[in-house]
C-alpha cells in the first residue's frame, strides 16, 4: 500500500498505531501544508507538487508485481486531499498504466452530516474526474456505514474504526478471487465486464454479509440463503441510496467459503425471479456470481455484493442540488479561483454530473421494446455529429 496525504498528522497516527509496522516507511508520502478542504489545492497547487514523489513510490510497488491487475484507491470526496489529489493521482496512473484496472472506494458526503460547507463543490469536481478516469467506483457514505453499525451491528457509538472495518471487509471480498483459489473465479476486469453496460455508468453500491452484532455471532447459522437474503437487503447498502427506488442494471455476488456452486446459482436465480421488477429486463442474466474457497478469518462463509443500480442517482442528485444552490450565488468560489481554477470548470463538472443522473434515469425507464428506438436515436445523433 502507498499512503499519501498533504499533512503529516494522519500519517503519524497510522505509523504509531497497531498496524504501523506493516507498511514500508518509504510508502508514507506526505506534504506539510494541508489542502484545507480545497479541491483546487489538492488537484492543482499543493497536490501537484507532491504527486511526483507519490508516483515514484507507486511505480516501485507496481514493478514488484509479477502480474499487475490494477489499482485500488481509497479516498473521500468531501475534503481537499482525497478529492483533489486523489483524482489527480488517478488520472496520472491512468496515463502511465492505461490498460490496468482502476478501482476506487469513494466516500461521498453524507446527506445529514456535513463536515465542511464546500463538500458539494469538492464532490462534484471529483465525480467529473471519476466518470472519465476510473473503471469502477464503489460508492460509500459515512452515514450509511454508521447506520449499519448502529442498526445491524448494534454498536451504540460506532467509531471510524468500525466504519473502516466494514469498508475493509468489502475490499477484501472484491479482491479475494485474485488472492485465493476458488471454484468460480473472478477478477477486477471480469467484474467490470459483467457490471458495466455503458462505460460512464460505473458507480456501484456495495454490501457485505454476514453482518452480526459482536454478541450474537455464535447463534447465527450461516447458510447460502441467509447470506443471499442479507446481502440483497437495502438496509445493508453502504451508501445513502435505496435500491428499491431504482432498478438493477447488473449485479455481482462474491461468495467465500466452502459451499456448493449449484446452491449459489439457485439462490441468485431465486432472487431475480422473486424481485424481477427490480432488474432491467433488457439485460438478460444480469447477476454474476463467483465463489472463492477461502473465507475471511473468523467466519465460515461470507459474501460481498456489488450492484450497479440506477438508484445511485439519488446520491448524485443530492450533491448536485447542494452544488447548484451554492454555485448560483458563487459562494466560496474565490477559494478555488484564487488557486487558479476557472468558473468554467465548475460549470462543466455540474453539467457532467447532471448528464450522469439523466443517463441513469433514462436506463431506469427503458424497457426491452424501447431498446431499438434508443439505438435509432443514437445513430441519428452520430449522423448529426458527423
Curated annotation (Swiss-Prot):
InterPro entries membership: Beta_tubulin (IPR002453), Tub_FtsZ_C (IPR008280), Tubulin (IPR000217), Tubulin/FtsZ-like_C (IPR037103), Tubulin/FtsZ_2-layer-sand-dom (IPR018316), Tubulin/FtsZ_GTPase_sf (IPR036525), Tubulin_C (IPR023123), Tubulin_CS (IPR017975)
Biased composition (Acidic residues): 367-386
Cofactor(s) named in the record: Mg(2+)
PROSITE patterns: TUBULIN
Amino-acid positions noted as binding Mg(2+) in the UniProt annotation, renumbered to this chain: 7
GO biological process, one term: microtubule-based process
Region feature (Disordered): 363-386
Keyword set, alphabetical order: Cytoplasm, Cytoskeleton, GTP-binding, Magnesium, Metal-binding, Microtubule, Nucleotide-binding
Chief location bin: cytoplasm
Subcellular location: Cytoplasm, Cytoskeleton
Cysteines engaged in disulfide bonds, as pairs: none
Keyword Chaperone: no
GO CC terms of this entry: cytoplasm; microtubule
GO molecular function, one term: GTP binding
Residues the record lists as binding GTP: 7, 76, 80-82, 142, 164
Family indicated by similarity: Belongs to the tubulin family.
Function per UniProt: Tubulin is the major constituent of microtubules, a cylinder consisting of laterally associated linear protofilaments composed of alpha- and beta-tubulin heterodimers. Microtubules grow by the addition of GTP-tubulin dimers to the microtubule end, where a stabilizing cap forms. Below the cap, tubulin dimers are in GDP-bound state, owing to GTPase activity of alpha-tubulin.
Assembly mode: Dimer of alpha and beta chains. A typical microtubule is a hollow water-filled tube with an outer diameter of 25 nm and an inner diameter of 15 nM. Alpha-beta heterodimers associate head-to-tail to form protofilaments running lengthwise along the microtubule wall with the beta-tubulin subunit facing the microtubule plus end conferring a structural polarity. Microtubules usually have 13 protofilaments but different protofilament numbers can be found in some organisms and specialized cells.
Protein name: Tubulin beta-1 chain
Native source organism of the sequence: Avena sativa (Oat)
Organism phylogeny: Eukaryota, Viridiplantae, Streptophyta, Embryophyta, Tracheophyta
